[in-house]
């Protein structure tokens, strides 16, 4: 097994980025960035704790859920979940976050890197309400880098091509949880938990 152990070695292998890739980072939102955020219903939030422990958490809501506060600040609402709060614990120790915003059907993505603050309340929480419920918390991100990421990973994977989707290659959620995570629980109980009622308690 051959490993890469230096930045110089890595550059020797990969070469230098093209000018349009090297110079695409910005620190403020363009109007097109605002339009992208308004059209995006889903993002991934990457964090790392002080000890290096990493987490990537999906966040999703109706399109436009990431609220633009000003040219360098956005906020992402937190909805009821499993209460692990792995990413939040990481942010308390290390505020640096990386975000990727998706628009279904598009092969490019919008990336945002910055410093996060956890908010327990703010006047704009009312704007984030869904079905009459305000968020429990919000992640406010001060933008340090923003740029668009190329489409090659999506093109290679054919991610948005329905003919490549095969969701039934694995057991349903309840059966998977019983097999991997909670073998002592009954499948009937897990089916009830992950059944139709599961989608009724999103907010």
Q: What is the predicted role of each segment?
A:
Residues 1-203:
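Binding-site signature for planar aromatic cofactors or substrates
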């Amino acid at each position: 097994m051959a490993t890469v152990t230096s930045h110089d070695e890595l550059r020797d292998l990969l070469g230098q980025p093209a000018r349009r890739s090297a110079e695409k980072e910005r620190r403020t939102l363009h109007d097109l960035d605002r339009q992208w955020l308004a059209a995006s219903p889903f993002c991934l939030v990457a964090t790392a704790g002080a000890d290096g422990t990493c987490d990537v958490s999906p966040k999703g809501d109706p399109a436009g859920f990431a609220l633009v506060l000003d040219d360098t600040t956005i906020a992402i609402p937190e909805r009821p979940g499993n209460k692990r709060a792995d990413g939040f614990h990481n942010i308390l120790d290390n505020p640096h976050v990386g975000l990727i915003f998706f628009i279904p059907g598009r092969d490019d993505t919008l990336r945002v890197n910055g410093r996060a603050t956890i908010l327990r309340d703010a006047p704009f929480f009312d704007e984030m309400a869904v079905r009459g419920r305000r968020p429990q918390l919000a992640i406010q991100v001060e933008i340090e880098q923003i740029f668009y990421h190329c489409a090659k990973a999506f093109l290679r994977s054919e991610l948005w091509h329905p003919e490549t989707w095969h969701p039934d290659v694995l057991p349903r959620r309840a059966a998977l949880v019983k097999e991997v995570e909670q073998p002592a629980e009954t499948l009937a109980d897990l089916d009830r938990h992950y059944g139709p009622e599961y989608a009724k308690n999103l907010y």
